[in-house]
From Swiss-Prot:
Catalysed reactions, as listed in the record: (R)-methylmalonyl-CoA = (S)-methylmalonyl-CoA
Disease: Methylmalonyl-CoA epimerase deficiency: Autosomal recessive inborn error of amino acid metabolism, involving valine, threonine, isoleucine and methionine. This organic aciduria may present in the neonatal period with life-threatening metabolic acidosis, hyperammonemia, feeding difficulties, pancytopenia and coma.
Name this protein carries in UniProt: Methylmalonyl-CoA epimerase, mitochondrial
Family: Belongs to the methylmalonyl-CoA epimerase family.
Any one cellular-component term (Gene Ontology): mitochondrion
Residue interval of the organelle targeting sequence: 1-36
Organism of this sequence: Homo sapiens (Human)
Gene that encodes it: MCEE
Localization per Swiss-Prot or TrEMBL: Mitochondrion
Modified residues (N6-succinyllysine): 114, 150
Major place of residence: mitochondrion
Keywords: Acetylation, Cobalt, Isomerase, Metal-binding, Mitochondrion, Transit peptide
Enzyme class: isomerase
Taxonomic placement: Eukaryota, Metazoa, Chordata, Craniata, Vertebrata
Transmembrane regions listed in the UniProt entry: none
Amino acid sequence: MARVLKAAAANAVGLFSRLQAPIPTVRASSTSQPLDQVTGSVWNLGRLNHVAIAVPDLEKAAAFYKNILGAQVSEAVPLPEHGVSVVFVNLGNTKMELLHPLGRDSPIAGFLQKNKAGGMHHICIEVDNINAAVMDLKKKKIRSLSEEVKIGAHGKPVIFLHPKDCGGVLVELEQA
């Protein structure tokens, strides 16, 4: 019995030392440039501006972020030119937009018909030169949902990129 225990202990030590062996360093493919700067680029990505969430009940959603999570939450702001009412949720390093449809023609109404509980609608990323970004992305065969840049909910130029060209995510680019 002692011999069996000794052998088991030796095997365990051997297994443990194999588990402790240094893991080989794997270097991810990268360039020496930061992700937001590409050599020769005439535009650069900035920070994540916001994540927009379509909600079936704007008051309930706003109360959750304010009363349960303790976030700073704005009053509801109707934006008829965009077909939504929006509540802005300040998260410190970024924002969330809670979107609720204004009328049946709202793009958010269609989203909520397909997603009854609501959900993430889009992300917004700032760019330093939206016109250059649009021209460059067109050359790269990335489609947008409109032909031209429009003024967004924050009063800045924006354009939405087609989700089929962006890994299934609706991406809004906003002039920083």
